[in-house]
């Protein structure tokens, strides 16, 4: 009952958008999860797929796990730091632009 993790920190993605994709694959077998992510047309799907592939590679290389039996045990997306930017407006004013980041955590196991 081994578990292997992969983490991606500081991704330029909003937490809510990342969680929508994470909810799609939680608890599924990894081949089914990769299939879902391949055909999900969201930016977050590409990011989560890379982290999931990394977790699968870690499980195979470090733990010698059989890929066919792996499942997505846990996947969660947490809020990271928010990058604060500035854009010029009329009459010498300025507005703040928030560019949110998040951290993606994936654990696979059998």
From Swiss-Prot:
Signal peptide: none annotated. Transmembrane segments: none annotated. Coiled coil: none annotated. Pfam families: Ribosomal_L22. GO terms for molecular function: rRNA binding; structural constituent of ribosome. GO terms for cellular component: cytosolic large ribosomal subunit. Gene3D superfamilies: Ribosomal protein L22/L17. One of its GO terms (biological process) is translation. The keyword DNA repair does not apply. InterPro entries: Ribosomal_uL22, Ribosomal_uL22_bac/chlpt-type, Ribosomal_uL22_bac/org-type, Ribosomal_uL22_CS, Ribosomal_uL22_sf. Keywords: Ribonucleoprotein, Ribosomal protein, RNA-binding, rRNA-binding. Part of the 50S ribosomal subunit. Belongs to the universal ribosomal protein uL22 family. NCBIfam families: rplV_bact. This protein binds specifically to 23S rRNA; its binding is stimulated by other ribosomal proteins, e.g. L4, L17, and L20. It is important during the early stages of 50S assembly. It makes multiple contacts with different domains of the 23S rRNA in the assembled 50S subunit and ribosome. This is Large ribosomal subunit protein uL22.
